[in-house]
Amino acid sequence: MNLVPTVIEQSSRGERAYDIYSRLLKDRIIMLSGPIDDDLANSIISQLLFLDAQDSEKDIYLYINSPGGVVTAGLAIYDTMNFIKSDVQTIVMGMAASMASVLASSGTKGKRFALPHSEVMIHQPSGGAQGQQTEIEIAAEQILKTRKELNTILAENSGQPLEKINIDTERDNYLSAQDAVEYGLIDGIMEKNANLK
């Protein structure tokens, strides 16, 4: 059971109650938390498009705490981040693993951050296949194609050679916030709001 806090704001016209996520959206803050699936992706994409249509000159702040999830859903968010005109600042809090690490590194260059005790984890995509031999071969080819696509994005975002990304994503590879900065996945560590290390 997920309880969503309510925030009450006073104005000259009286009180107004918002769920916390709607209130954060007024400040151009989007929360990407939990496993990435189609429903979460649709919610994030809708918020990105709404904020960009509202004012494409202002930054959007995407806070990420996610174990990753469905690659196609994550790539839909990735494509939208690149499609809109607004700069997207990414801020990792807690963990950005798997597909979430790709999104964290895909924020606007110079505006990709992590909180001091957060972690980033990169690895190869996982999947399973069953059925006839040809179906298993098709699934294996698809996962190899997906791995190449994700590693290419990580290489572009980090500035690391694709060969290094291929090696470093063979297994789960956990990076502290500082390690993620040195690797090139993020640009800085946020000690305080708008105060970068």
Curated annotation (Swiss-Prot):
The active site is at 98 (nucleophile), 123. It comes from the Bacteria. GO terms for cellular component: cytoplasm; endopeptidase Clp complex. It is found in: Cytoplasm. Gene3D superfamilies: 2-enoyl-CoA Hydratase, Chain A, domain 1 (3.90.226.10). It catalyses: Hydrolysis of proteins to small peptides in the presence of ATP and magnesium. alpha-casein is the usual test substrate. In the absence of ATP, only oligopeptides shorter than five residues are hydrolyzed (such as succinyl-Leu-Tyr-|-NHMec, and Leu-Tyr-Leu-|-Tyr-Trp, in which cleavage of the -Tyr-|-Leu- and -Tyr-|-Trp bonds also occurs). This is ATP-dependent Clp protease proteolytic subunit. The gene is clpP.
